[in-house]
From Swiss-Prot:
SUPFAM superfamilies: Nucleotide-diphospho-sugar transferases
Recorded family membership: Belongs to the mimivirus L137 family.
InterPro entries linked to this entry: Nucleotide-diphossugar_trans
Protein name per its UniProtKB record: Uncharacterized protein L137
Amino acid sequence: MHKIPCFVLIYEQFDIIKKCLTFLTKYAHRLHIVIIENYSVNTNQQIKPYVMDLLEKGIICKYYLFEENIANNAVHIVLEEAIAKYLDPTVFPYVFVTDGDLTIEDTNWIDEHVNIMDKHKNVFICGCSLDNSNLPTKTMPNAVHWIKPGIDQGDYIKGITGTTFTLHRTNELIEAIKFFNSKGWRYLDSNLHKFCFDAKRMIWARTKKAKCYHLTWDLYLDLTHPYTIMKLKNVNTMWKRSQSSKFQLYENSSDLRLDIYQELNDTKETIIVRKLKVISSGFDLGLDQSGIEYNGIFYPASRGFTVYTITDETVSVSNFDTHINSCTVNLARHIRESYRSGCHYIISVVHDDGFKKLSKNQLKEVGGLLSLDKIFYLYIRFSYYFVYDNIHKSLIDEDVSKVSFLSKEFSDLKFSKLISNNQITPSSTISNSNSQDLNIPDSTIIPLLSNNNGPITKQYHIVCLKWMLMFYREYIESFGSLLNIDYILLDNFNNYNYINSPEHVYIFCQLTDDSLLTKPFQKMILNTEQLTIAKYMDRTRKYINHGIQIIDYSIENIKLCNNPSTIYLPYQYSDSEIQILKKLYDSTPKKYDLVFCGSISQRRRYILDSLKSHGVSILELVTGHWGHPRDVEMASCKMLINIHYAHDYNIYESMRCDRWAFATMPVVSEDSIHYGLLDVKKHGLITFCEYDQLILKTLEALKNFKKTNENIINTVKKEREHQLIKVFTELK
C-alpha cells in the first residue's frame, strides 16, 4: 500500500515547527511528508537547515520554500502543482493537509481518519478534533468559540474543523481545487466548508478518539509575545492575502513520483482502477438524482434511458426519453454502436419512468448482445440500470426494481494505460511560473456566518411528507447546507420518534399533524404557501396561536400575516445550483420563445393562447416536471412567464422564477399583492405588470430580448445573503 501524501504548512516559529515535525516524522513509514514554508526571518538560520536535514535523510520527500509569506495561498499553489505532476488519485486515494503547529498523542490517528472516510461515503472530509486543555480563554475570551460543538454520529463527530490534519479523498480534493479556481478562491477552511455543504451537500467529520494539541495556543497565553502581537494586529487581513510568490522546490531522490513508478520500465502498461456509483430513480422523488458518479464527477440522467459510454477519463452521455417518445429503435442502435466502438464500459440508467413509450420487442437484439435479462421486466416507474464491460464483453451487473429507486457502487472498474518514464522525470529545483494574483472576494457567505460568533450548533431537521418534497426541494437546498440541516422524509408525521432536546429542532414543511402541536419537542413551520388563500392563512394562524415560530419564503406573506416573530428566509443564490442553470441556459439551443411551468387554469390558458395567436412559441410544462429533467427542458426557452393560478393566488412565485432570473433568463411576471416590497421588483430583476398587460409586456420583452443584468443579480444576491445572516443569528 502506498503512503498517504501529507502537506504541512509552516511559518516562523521554529520551536513549534520542530515539535510538530518531530511528532509527524515518527509516521514517515505511513506518510509522504511534504513541507510548505512561507518565508520568515527565521527561515535561513533555523528552519531551512532543519528541514533540509530531514530531506537529505529521506524522512520527508519534498520541501517547497516560498520567497514571501502568502499564507494559505502557498498551500493552494502547491496543491495545484501536485495535482498537475504527481498526485494521481488512482495511486493515492487519500491526502492529508494540515497546519504545522499541531501534535497528536493517539498513535492510531491515521487509521481512525482513513476508517471514517472508507466507511462513510457521505463524509467529504475528516479533520482531527482539537484538545481544549490549552485553549487561551484567559487572554482571549472569544476563544470559547474556537472549538465548535459537534454531533456524535457513532464512528465520528459531525462538525467543522480548521486545517487540522484534514483527510481528503484525492479525487474530491482535485474537484475542490478546480471549483476554487473557477471562483477565484484558494484553499482555505472557510472555502472548503462552503464547497462541502453548498456544492457537494456532504458531511464534515472530525475524529472521536484522536485529538490534536494546538501548539500556537501556548503562545497566546502571553499577550506580549511577538507572534501573538502579530496575529492580533493582522487578524482581519491575514486570511485575505491574494498575492502569489515564486518558490524553490527541493526533492529527495526517493521522491513521490519515483516511489509510484519505481517498477516501471521506459514504457509499461499499468492498470488504472476507477470507482463508479450508479443511481436510478424510476419516479422523480427522493434526495438522489439519477445518474452516475465517476472519477469524482456526477453526470445526471434525464427522463427515460440515459446511456453512458466510458473510455478511461472520457464519459459520453446520450438520452432517450422513452416516456414521451417512441425512440426505442434509436436507443437500441446507440447501444449496438457503443458495443462496436471499443469503449471500455457501457452503462444505462432509467430516470423518472422509461417505460411508457418503450418497445421491448425492439430491445431483443441488444438484450441478447449484452446478455441483458432484467430489462424485459421494466414497467411503469420502475428503476433500472445495467453496467457492461465492453472490453471483456461481459455484463457486470443489471437490476430492476418496482420500488422506484436503485443505487450501487462499483469500486474496481479497470483500465489499461501506457505510462512513459520521460513524463515523470523529477527536477531538483522548480520556480513557480503562475504569477497571477488569486482574486479573493471581500466576503463569502460562509466566513460571514462563521464570524457571527460561530456556526449554528443546533441540529435542524427538515420534516417533510415524501410526496411533497419535490415542490420546494430547490428552495430548501439553496440555504439548507449552510444552516446545519438534514432531511426526515415520512409517510405519516406520527411515524417518527422526535427528540425533546434544545439541540434538535424540527422544521415541518407547510404543515404538521395537529396531534403533534402540543408535544414537548422543538418545532417550527416552513411556509411556502400563498397566504392570500384563506385556508393557508387560517392554518398559519393556528400554528402561531400554538406558539410555533414560522419561517416564510415570502416578504408579502409576512406583510399579510403581520406576526413579528415570523422569520423571512428568501430563496438564496446557491453558486452550485446557478452555475448548472447558467451552463444549461447558455449552451442549450433555443426551441421556444417562452416557457410556462405550473398547473393550467382558465386565466393562465387565456394568456398562453393569446400569446400563441401572436406567433409566440411556448413550452408548457404542466404536470410531472421536476428536478434536473425539467431544467433541461426549460433551458431550451428564451424567457419564463409567470401567471397566477387564480385571483386569490396573489403572492409572487419566487421559487419558480428567482433561480432562473439568477441564471440570466428574463422573467415576465404578473404583479402581486405587495410586489413593491420585493427586491426583484426594486432592482428590476423581474419585469412585473398587471394581468391585463401580460401579453403586451411579454411581446415587448421578446422583441427587445436581453439577458438579465449580472450587476442586478449580484445586488439581489448580496441582499439575500445579509438576510440569511439575520436568520443565522436568530436560529443559532
